[in-house]
Structures are given as structure tokens and as C-alpha cells.
A protein has these predicted regions:
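C-terminal peripheral helix-coil segments that are non-catalytic and often amphipathic
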Residues: 91, 132, 136-143, 158, ...
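Amphipathic alpha-helical linker/stalk segments
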Residues: 57-88, 96, 100, 104, ...
Length: 204
């Protein structure tokens, strides 16, 4: 799958908005400040995004883009289920433990009591999109006749939950804590091995 050409103005706005949200939080950032940070005119900003909510949703979607592209490529281009899931898990771990992704997660949790729409916006723009793609993949495996996955919804949720686990909580609570490349690789390997034995039932 080839990604669409990036609009330089849109990307500048997303980069500026990401910097502002992470530095100042959601409530303390105005559309005027984002326009200045980009820097673009207010007219250009509103031509791309009509509200601060829409802009935050785009920031979250942008962070998730690489994972969603990997999922699409892996599940369409190859019949090797274990390899496909390894690619998806590797991309997911890179996203889950990325500094910006952790910071956005903290921001949404901190701001949600006063801006309850942020939690739903975050979920729809990030985790839900990934879950839906993986659920669809598991349903296709069932339909193909080679696998019998009893509950594709639970199976998809369990997959991403195992990649987060206690480590994700500790990284959220300790800003300096990050898994090394070897630790992430080991996490992926262990999750895939457990998953292939315990969650996906290949028909003999």
C-alpha cells in the first residue's frame, strides 16, 4: 500500500499542534497559538481543521498511521499468519512505547475529567481503528477455513493488551523509562509464541 503524498501545510500544522499540546496541554492551547507554532495563517489552519478537537484527532491518527499501514500490508500481502502478526506486533510496540504516544496518552488522561470528549476522541482515532482492523483479519482467517478463532473481538483485544501489560503502565508513570530495542523484540517474540499456541486454533 502506498501512502498518499503529504500536504506540507497540513504536516506543518500537525507538527506544530503536537509540540503545543505536549508542551502546554489541551486546555491551554488555542487555535491561534497553533497557527503561530506551525507557522501558518489562521485561514490556512481553519481550511484544514475546523476545531481543536479535529486537530487533536488528526494528531492521534498521524501517530497511528504507520501501525495501520503495516496491518493493512501484512494482512493483505502474505498468507504467513505468524509473520503477519509479528510485523503488526513490532509496529504496535514501536507506537505504544514512542515518547509522543506516551505523552499524548498522559495528556488525554489528565484532561479528560474536564474535557470528557477527549477520551472518546482518542479511542476512536487510535486504539479502535487498530482493533477493528485486527478483528477483521481474524474473521477473514476463520472464513478461509484454516483457523477457528472463537471470538475475534476478544482475540484482537487480547493481542494488543499483551503488548502493553504492566510495562506500559510503568512507562506512563516514569517518563524516563523506555524499553530497549532488545526488550521490545523479546516482548514481541514472547507474545507471538504465546498467542500462536493459546489463541489461534489452526484446523488440522
Amino acid at each position: 500500500m502506498t501512502s498518499e503524498p503529504t500536504d506540507p501545510k497540513r504536516q506543518a500544522i500537525l507538527d506544530g499542534a503536537t509540540r503545543m499540546f505536549l508542551a502546554h496541554g489541551y486546555r491551554n492551547v488555542s487555535m491561534d497559538k497553533i497557527a503561530q507554532a506551525a507557522p501558518v495563517s489562521k485561514a490556512t489552519l481553519y481550511n484544514h481543521f475546523d476545531s481543536k478537537n479535529a486537530l487533536l484527532a488528526a494528531v492521534i491518527s498521524s501517530l497511528c498511521e504507520a501501525l495501520l499501514q503495516t496491518m493493512t500490508q501484512a494482512t493483505i500481502e502474505s498468507d504467513d499468519v505468524e509473520n503477519n502478526l509479528t510485523q503488526i506486533a513490532t509496529s504496535a510496540v514501536d507506537l505504544i512505547y514512542a515518547e509522543d504516544a506516551l505523552a499524548i496518552y498522559r495528556l488525554v488522561v489528565a484532561e479528560s475529567p474536564d474535557f470528557p470528549e477527549l477520551g472518546q476522541l482518542f479511542y476512536q482515532s487510535g486504539p479502535q481503528a487498530a482493533l477493528t482492523q485486527l478483528e477483521d483479519y481474524f474473521r477473514r482467517l476463520n472464513a478461509g477455513g484454516s483457523y477457528n478463532i472463537a471470538d475475534p473481538v476478544f482475540a484482537a483485544d487480547a493481542f494488543f493488551s499483551m503488548l502493553r501489560g504492566d510495562l506500559h503502565v510503568r512507562c506512563l508513570l516514569t517518563k524516563t523509562l523506555r524499553p530497549s530495542a532488545d526488550e521490545k523484540k523479546r516482548l514481541v517474540s514472547q507474545v507471538i509464541a504465546f498467542y500462536m499456541r493459546g489463541m489461534l486454533y489452526a484446523k488440522s
